[in-house]
């Protein structure tokens, strides 16, 4: 009998991607985050779609429409908080996924890695424009501060900012276009994710050892489908716990005050997942320098494959590199903490030191230590 799964043009694509895909037999739970990101994306698109049915992208009614969703729409509060906290889960999975790639040398699949960096930037853009939509105080001032950074670009900066705003300040036109961007970007992310997967399946997955696993592959289904389902259950459990018990834990109380251009909040700060980059931005006293550092803090990921000096792909057997990797994680956590603190002593100097350490670790220390490890192994 002919198996339709292997012959039908559409089923064949799905089969080769999720069922008969040869997968290394030793990949750990750190490889779960790819599928979890897919799950997050689907959840965000679905909850977002239902929110868009009731939301109005107009400065006079946006805040009220979000209140209306929470009060009057059936399970509207649940959909809204699933969407808001779903974004946090998305970024947790995203950072874990990138961390896994850095630790195990997955960045050596350069096409996959570069599409991944592009995906990160697109998700960050989506989260930023989405945060503006409830039109609370932090929405308005966050949009004002972050879009204003573009004015640091020489010559065209001011014109560019006014072009993005659609006027001379963040107003009705800005909110409308941000809603349009927030609606379209997830579909672009979906397309990019498909390309990301396409490139990955050209090479096959990496594994914790970093050694080619062509001679030891197992089918994706049932081994990793069941493992992914377990991961998905944990993710959903965490998301539901957050949404039902502490929906506002990760949010900002200022966003429950309607946007007011005449009153600036005491501390303007983005959502927690952008705080590390915000801390790097603030650590440089010069506007253009800060913007460049902010950009480089993310775009530095593109250069990681070029900074690989070790003759081993993974950090599994490299204790000194492991130490530096976890120092980098600690540094990023420090930056995240600093980003949420007011601009005063001692936070300023701690932020500056953490920012310097971030770039020094990636650009200097890690490549140097990799070379030393090669020497120690007489390679």
Curated annotation (Swiss-Prot):
Keywords: Electron transport, Heme, Iron, Membrane, Metal-binding, Mitochondrion, Mitochondrion inner membrane, Respiratory chain, Transmembrane, Transmembrane helix, Transport, Ubiquinone. InterPro entries: Cyt_b/b6_C (IPR005798), Cyt_b/b6_C_sf (IPR036150), Cyt_b/b6_N (IPR005797), Cytb/b6-like_sf (IPR027387), Cytochrome_b (IPR030689), Cytochrome_b_C_euk/bac (IPR048260), Cytochrome_b_N_euk/bac (IPR048259), Di-haem_cyt_TM (IPR016174). It is found in: Mitochondrion inner membrane. GO terms for cellular component: mitochondrial inner membrane; respiratory chain complex III. One of its GO terms (molecular function) is metal ion binding. Pfam families: Cytochrom_B_C, Cytochrome_B. Binds 2 heme b groups non-covalently. A ubiquinone binds at residue 201. The chain crosses the membrane at residues 33-53, 77-98, 113-133, 178-198, 226-246, 288-308, 320-340, 347-367. Heme b b562 binds at residues 83, 182. It is a multi-pass membrane protein. One of its GO terms (biological process) is mitochondrial electron transport, ubiquinol to cytochrome c. Heme b b566 binds at residues 97, 196. Component of the ubiquinol-cytochrome c reductase complex (complex III or cytochrome b-c1 complex) that is part of the mitochondrial respiratory chain. The b-c1 complex mediates electron transfer from ubiquinol to cytochrome c. Contributes to the generation of a proton gradient across the mitochondrial membrane that is then used for ATP synthesis. Heme 1 (or BL or b562) is low-potential and absorbs at about 562 nm, and heme 2 (or BH or b566) is high-potential and absorbs at about 566 nm. The cytochrome bc1 complex contains 11 subunits: 3 respiratory subunits (MT-CYB, CYC1 and UQCRFS1), 2 core proteins (UQCRC1 and UQCRC2) and 6 low-molecular weight proteins (UQCRH/QCR6, UQCRB/QCR7, UQCRQ/QCR8, UQCR10/QCR9, UQCR11/QCR10 and a cleavage product of UQCRFS1). This cytochrome bc1 complex then forms a dimer. Belongs to the cytochrome b family. PANTHER family: CYTOCHROME B. This is Cytochrome b. It comes from Cephalorhynchus heavisidii. The gene is MT-CYB.
């Amino acid at each position: 009998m002919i198996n339709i799964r292997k012959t039908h043009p559409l089923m064949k694509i799905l089969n080769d991607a999720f069922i008969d895909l040869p997968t290394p037999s030793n990949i750990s739970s750190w490889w779960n985050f790819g599928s979890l990101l897919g799950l997050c994306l689907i959840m965000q698109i679905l909850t977002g779609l239902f929110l868009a049915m009731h939301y109005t992208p107009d400065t006079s009614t946006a805040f009220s429409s979000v209140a209306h969703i929470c009060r009057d729409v059936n399970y509207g509060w649940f959909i809204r908080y699933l969407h808001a906290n779903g974004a946090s889960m998305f970024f947790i999975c995203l950072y874990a996924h990138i961390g896994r790639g850095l630790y195990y040398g997955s960045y050596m699949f350069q096409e996959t890695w570069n599409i991944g960096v592009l995906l990160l930037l697109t998700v960050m853009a989506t989260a930023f424009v989405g945060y503006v939509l409830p039109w609370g105080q932090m929405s308005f001032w966050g949009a004002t501060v972050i879009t204003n950074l573009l004015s640091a670009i020489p010559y065209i900066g001011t014109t560019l900012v006014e072009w993005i705003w659609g006027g001379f300040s963040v107003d009705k036109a800005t909110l409308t276009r941000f809603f349009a961007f927030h609606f379209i970007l997830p579909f672009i992310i979906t397309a990019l994710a498909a390309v990301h997967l396409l490139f990955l399946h050209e090479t096959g997955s990496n594994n914790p050892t970093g050694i080619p696993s062509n001679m030891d592959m197992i089918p994706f289904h049932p081994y990793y489908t069941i493992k992914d389902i377990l991961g998905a259950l944990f993710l959903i459990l965490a998301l539901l716990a957050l949404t039902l018990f502490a929906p506002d834990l990760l949010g900002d109380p200022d966003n429950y005050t309607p946007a007011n251009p005449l009153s600036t909040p005491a501390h303007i700060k983005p959502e927690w997942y952008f705080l590390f980059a915000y801390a790097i931005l603030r650590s440089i006293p010069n506007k253009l320098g800060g913007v460049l550092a902010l950009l480089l803090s993310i775009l530095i990921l593109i250069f990681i494959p070029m900074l690989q000096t070790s003759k081993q792909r993974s950090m599994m057997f490299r204790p000194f590199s492991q130490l530096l990797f976890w120092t980098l994680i600690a540094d990023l956590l420090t930056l995240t903490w600093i980003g949420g603190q007011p601009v005063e002593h001692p936070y300023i100097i701690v932020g500056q030191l953490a920012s310097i350490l971030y770039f020094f670790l990636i650009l200097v220390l890690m490549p140097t230590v990799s070379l030393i490890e090669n020497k120690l192994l007489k390679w």
